[in-house]
Amino acid sequence: MINRYSRPEMANIWSEENKYRAWLEVEILADEAWAELGEIPKEDVAKIREKADFDIDRILEIEQQTRHDVVAFTRAVSETLGEERKWVHFGLTSTDVVDTAYGYLYKQANAIIRKDLDNFLSIIADKAKEHKFTIMMGRTHGVHAEPTTFGLKLATWYSEMKRNIERFEHAAAGVEAGKISGAVGNFANIPPFVEKYVCDKLGIRAQEISTQVLPRDLHAEYFAVLASIATSIERMATEIRGLQKSEQREVEEFFAKGQKGSSAMPHKRNPIGSENMTGLARVIRGHMVTAYENVSLWHERDISHSSAERIIAPDTTILIDYMLNRFGNIVKNLTVFPENMKRNMGSTFGLIFSQRAMLTLIEKGMTREQAYDLVQPKTAQSWDNQVDFKPLLEADPEITSRLSQEEIDEIFNPVYYTKRVDEIFDRIGLGD
């Protein structure tokens, strides 16, 4: 992933140095397991643990000849050892090392993502509580519907991210796995003890059955969950973009002193962070498709998945880490304009209270059809002529014969729409 969208801690996990360190650890742990079984002299394993190392340039040099990165790696490591070098890669096939190391790298990446998710959820919770009763316009189809609160909008984000966290924990466990079962997965040249020993030491699970590779449905699910997280962020970002439009200006991304919004128009303050999230979510969903394409391999294995995973594994985890942190800061520092929200509610002449007017008339004895057919023409008159809805109700004897002035006034009270907010917050775990 390019540096622009990378954070150092996550990027370092996918560095060549860290990858080869993981490979080397798998190799050494496998030898330790063999030694536990009495198949390899423990003194040789001790020498391997002490002296085994690699030089990346040397690996690449050897690979120019071998055209096989694992063979190049094992030969480069062997050059740093004495006679004990014969135990390097003993009983292993390349993917025993690569897939198990991948499981270990995913574990490292997931630890960062887990912290990111927890921090992001906390930011949303704080902002939702802050604006729990900040009344604003609810919109459906882009059209004014009925009042809601900005806190409730944020609460839907909170609930969605909680579900994403649950999905993430399940999917993360799937890819934090290793396999050391040999060339076709039948343990012909290596006992299951070695697999269990290595995986236990790495803190990952041993996959119960494999071919030459771990089953890639595990990875497809994992990348699908990361895509779900990215898409949730995109949904939230799209909301901010919509609410920041000049004619609404209900929220605004923080705009720093000296920041520029356009090379041509000095007045511009664009929601570039949220737009950035939309673009990156598209990339991650594309990687999800690639992960699903990787499931169908020939027989016990081919390497069609390998080239793709060298890209999507680092890029997707790096991007999710970046997105959670950047969008978390956007939400944390978001400027909210309650007065603009109030102003916008009034821009549709009180029509947003039409359902309540209809329901109140039903409560006073009208059928639903009668009430609907009485109210709807007045909404059309209000909208078409750009006049307030309330006076049209007050001028109709059929309505005033059923409703007092106080009851009509109450219909147009936006606070009515906040009466269940506490209950909803309690239901999703955001109650005080």
From Swiss-Prot:
Q: Which SUPFAM superfamilies match?
A: L-aspartase-like
Which residues of the sequence carry a binding annotation for N(6)-(1,2-dicarboxyethyl)-AMP?
Answer: 4-5, 67-69, 93-94, 212, 263, 268-270, 276, 307-311
Keywords, A to Z, come to: Lyase, Purine biosynthesis
Keyword Lyase attributed: yes
Catalyzed reaction equations: N(6)-(1,2-dicarboxyethyl)-AMP = fumarate + AMP; (2S)-2-[5-amino-1-(5-phospho-beta-D-ribosyl)imidazole-4-carboxamido]succinate = 5-amino-1-(5-phospho-beta-D-ribosyl)imidazole-4-carboxamide + fumarate
What Enzyme Commission number(s) apply to this enzyme? 4.3.2.2
> GO molecular-function annotation terms?
(S)-2-(5-amino-1-(5-phospho-D-ribosyl)imidazole-4-carboxamido) succinate lyase (fumarate-forming) activity; N6-(1,2-dicarboxyethyl)AMP AMP-lyase (fumarate-forming) activity
Pfam families according to UniProt:
ADSL_C, Lyase_1
Pathway per the UniProt entry: Purine metabolism; AMP biosynthesis via de novo pathway; AMP from IMP: step 2/2; Purine metabolism; IMP biosynthesis via de novo pathway; 5-amino-1-(5-phospho-D-ribosyl)imidazole-4-carboxamide from 5-amino-1-(5-phospho-D-ribosyl)imidazole-4-carboxylate: step 2/2
- Any single Gene Ontology cellular-component annotation: cytosol
- At the top of the EC hierarchy, this enzyme's class is lyase
Q: Which domain of life is it from?
A: Bacteria
Q: Name one GO biological process term.
A: 'de novo' AMP biosynthetic process
What residues make up the catalytic site?
141 (proton donor/acceptor), 262 (proton donor/acceptor)
Concerning PROSITE patterns, the annotation shows: FUMARATE_LYASES
Task: Quote the subunit structure annotation.
Answer: Homodimer and homotetramer. Residues from neighboring subunits contribute catalytic and substrate-binding residues to each active site.
**What biological function has been recorded for the protein in this entry?**
Catalyzes two reactions in de novo purine nucleotide biosynthesis. Catalyzes the breakdown of 5-aminoimidazole- (N-succinylocarboxamide) ribotide (SAICAR or 2-[5-amino-1-(5-phospho-beta-D-ribosyl)imidazole-4-carboxamido]succinate) to 5-aminoimidazole-4-carboxamide ribotide (AICAR or 5-amino-1-(5-phospho-beta-D-ribosyl)imidazole-4-carboxamide) and fumarate, and of adenylosuccinate (ADS or N(6)-(1,2-dicarboxyethyl)-AMP) to adenosine monophosphate (AMP) and fumarate.
By sequence similarity, the record places it as follows:
Belongs to the lyase 1 family. Adenylosuccinate lyase subfamily.
The identity of this protein, by name, is Adenylosuccinate lyase
State the species of origin: Streptococcus mutans serotype c (strain ATCC 700610 / UA159)
